[in-house]
């Protein structure tokens, strides 16, 4: 009997140790996985940095990944997040259509996904979709571009990736304004896939075919910087350039007279707000907000460029 009692006490002690271990795990910081198209691109890098800073401030562990606009790699990274038992995923996705299945996969196992910058072509799958008011921002940029062009002359439009809804929305916003000016004439419209090197090469070619151009309006700042490099190399510093994002590079180009304007979309704030909503959802089971949330953009010109730093106006 004494032996049985000792064995029972030992089993109870082991059970208590196991429970204590579970309690310790429960107190450990939960994991927030942050996935963006790139960690090297300044815009996406600031998204990741902003999300990471806020998540750590709120007590979460973090993992940062980039999918390189590859939907298959994005799906693999979602699998990694699932395998690591992530509490939530902050995602700037790899395509409106091609990302739906990946977001649904996370949802199916109970991991909420909070989208930033780019929306997907479905509702009710992501817990939140926090995007810039791309149409409003594009109209701001186009108005500044028209003014920089003196409301007349031939111009070029550089468009982003066709799979990214932001590219089409920004282009429509540009033309909502520019098409109202009868003396503005678009001589070329090409996709440079958000790439600085592609924009550089394409503007070089466009200059050979259309040396008369007076302006370049670009769907993001990376392409704008490629255009500026090509224009400067050709001795065409007289060509007006307007970008979209609010990067430090284009800020400096504006201050140096190499660009007319850019449009600031609040990358840092979007990412931090996504983490705040994720934390609220994990604590309360709801965000208290609509799924799609839109943040207005701001025009950056020489008048306020000095206040711009890391995609935020100080």
PLM ranges: what are they?
Residues 31-54, 58, 62-80, 84-86, ...:
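Extracytoplasmic "Venus flytrap"
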Residues 61, 97-136, 144-147, 154, ...:
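Flexible loop/hinge segments that line or gate small-molecule binding clefts
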Residues 74, 130-155, 169, 198-200, ...:
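Hydrophobic alpha-helical segments within soluble ligand-binding/sensing domains
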Residues 43-57, 137-141, 165-184, 198, ...:
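Short, solvent-exposed amphipathic alpha-helices that sit
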Residues 158, 162-166, 177-178, 269-314:
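Hinge/cleft segment of the Venus flytrap/periplasmic-binding protein
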Residues 1-31, 104-111, 314:
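Short, low-complexity disordered leader/linker segments with a strong preference
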Residues 91-107, 174, 192-252:
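Hydrophobic alpha-helical
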